[in-house]
Amino acid sequence: MINISFPDGSVKQFEKNITAFEIAVVISTSLAKAAMIAEINGDLKDLSTQIDNDCRLRILTAKDPECLEVIRHDAAHLTAEAVKELFPETQVTIGPAIENGYYYDFARDKPFTTDDLAVIEAKMHELAKKNEKVTRELWDREKAVEFFKSIGEHYKAEIIASIPSNEPISLYRQGNFIDLCRGPHAPSTGFVKHFKLMKVAGAYWRGDSRNEVLQRIYGTAWATKEQLESYLFMLEEAEKRDHRKLGKELDLFHFQEEAQGMVFWHDKGWSVYNTIEQYIRRKIRKNGYIEVKTPVLVDKSLWELSGHWEKFRDDMFALETDDKTLALKPMNCPCHVQIFKQGIKSYRDLPLRMSEFGLCHRNEASGALHGLMRVRSLVQDDAHIFCAEEQITDETVSFCKLLTEVYKDFGFTDIKVKFSDRPEVRAGSSETWDKAENALKEAVEKAGYSYTLNPGEGAFYGPKLEFVLTDAIGRQWQCGTLQMDFVLPERLDASYVAASGEKKRPVMLHRAILGSLERFIGILIEEYAGRFPLWLAPVQVAIATITSDLNDYALEVQKALIESGVRVDINISPDKINYKIREFSNQKVPMIAVIGKQEKENKQVTIRRLGTTEQEVLSIEQLIEYIREENSK
């Protein structure tokens, strides 16, 4: 007999070699009917898994979050089965679950069309309704290779050759379809009910541009109909808010082939950019930061010393000149250490908070570029805090408070924190890591945040915090970071004189609130759906005249607003007032100042706010004062 421990703390005895499904039947028929997979000693397994030792067991259903990835993996197999039935000449390759869905790569001469996707999806529903049994089989390696070659599945045969010899070759069979897979999978295709095929894209075999291009079908799958509908609605909203589309419509920026991954900022977009930079500059000055500027092009010898050349060489732009190799900096940290090293530093100089809006370049693959979200040329609100070990907690608390304040000003209040602790391969002693991790945990808690743990995901040189924002349609964006570094000060020989007179290495805290300004602006465009708040809007007030005889007064109003630092647009053309208002509304200007005969006589304007029908009559002084207060962030 074996002892099975259940989540409620109970322990029951069963005969050896009983399956997880058979145990589910003993517990209740309803559980057995809903059961998808088993968690045995923390590992996810098929329900058909035989248990011959004492263990901890959870029977999981679609209600359990662990099953969502299984549902998506099952949907990938269902997609492949449908494709093979409809297009038998197609070769299947790989089909993993990914965030919010899955994909499956196919080798086929003729491209899949949108109509093909609809047919494939219909076939998937048909196969799911058949509720085909899914079974796991272990095969001899040579037999598996020969089998896949015999049915023309040469990619599968190649995959088997790359599987370590000590790993079993497991296949899953459903209906007439058989696929190479580690699993686990649900016991039948009927568990995959709520899915949709999304698009087709090209993908290199094994992600290598030297290999052939495959066709990748993307799909999404969820545990419930409501979850699927919610996700599709979110995608619909995201499409409406796409910063690339709005960037063009609102005349903010553009990209072109001659400078891939580099932004052409138009005047309105550059206004938003500069407003954000000036806002951050005011915040960090109030918080005791100095601002510096370091070279964009630096000799590779510094990058070799810092370790970046070894780790990031492929992502750096380099050029040869005067028998030297120079590289465009991908980050600012080594240059900041050079400034720290100028002159003798004392413990009295610490903490030293050094910031820079540093222009960085990263050689991102062209296929990874995505509007403002992924670029090759970027500016970060980057800063490095050089401090003593005993100052880590206070500096982290201070940073968390600043970050919270900044995010709130931009309208983000749902902030999640991820804490990444020591990886297996790391620099520094266990004692140093203990101190660092405890200091960060204490600081996060003092700042009023809870956190989720990412075990082993810290960098080799120190633990880190990641700050994740949730936007208006529920998407999450990782923006802020705080990274502790014991290694770079050592590598670049940075030191300070302690109170005892001995030389010590400072701890270096790499920190950013927005991250890349380009990416953060992309996030803001989508968060606001292009409707920037008044203080951030590229045009804060648009002036529109009802008749041409009011133009002189309109120009007076424009002059007064500009002299007060207000960003203004004006339309004094003969066009009808409704047309002018509609045009400014389409440009998402937050305030439209309408000028008629009465407004001119009273030295006033009638304000219409974007998205409302309400109107408010203000004097020019009142309007300027209101905007001044909004701009004071």
Swiss-Prot record:
Alphabetized Gene3D superfamilies for the sequence: 3.10.20.30, 3.30.54.20, Anticodon-binding domain, Bira Bifunctional Protein, Domain 2, Threonyl-trna Synthetase, Chain A, domain 2
Organism: Rickettsia bellii (strain OSU 85-389)
SMART domains to which the protein is assigned, alphabetical: tRNA_SAD
Domain called TGS: residue spans: 1-61
Highest taxon, organism lineage: Bacteria
Cofactor remark: Binds 1 zinc ion per subunit.
NCBIfam families xrefs: thrS (TIGR00418)
Quaternary structure and interacting proteins, as annotated: Homodimer.
An annotated GO cellular component: cytoplasm
Name under which the protein is recorded: Threonine--tRNA ligase
Entry's family note: Belongs to the class-II aminoacyl-tRNA synthetase family.
PANTHER family with a match to the protein in the record: THREONINE--TRNA LIGASE, CHLOROPLASTIC_MITOCHONDRIAL 2, THREONINE-TRNA LIGASE
Catalysed conversion reaction: tRNA(Thr) + L-threonine + ATP = L-threonyl-tRNA(Thr) + AMP + diphosphate + H(+)
Cofactor(s) required, per the database record: Zn(2+)
Keywords carried by this UniProt record: Aminoacyl-tRNA synthetase, ATP-binding, Cytoplasm, Ligase, Metal-binding, Nucleotide-binding, Protein biosynthesis, RNA-binding, tRNA-binding, Zinc
Catalytic: region residues: 242-533
Sites where the protein binds Zn(2+): 333, 384, 510
GO biological-process terms attached to the record: threonyl-tRNA aminoacylation
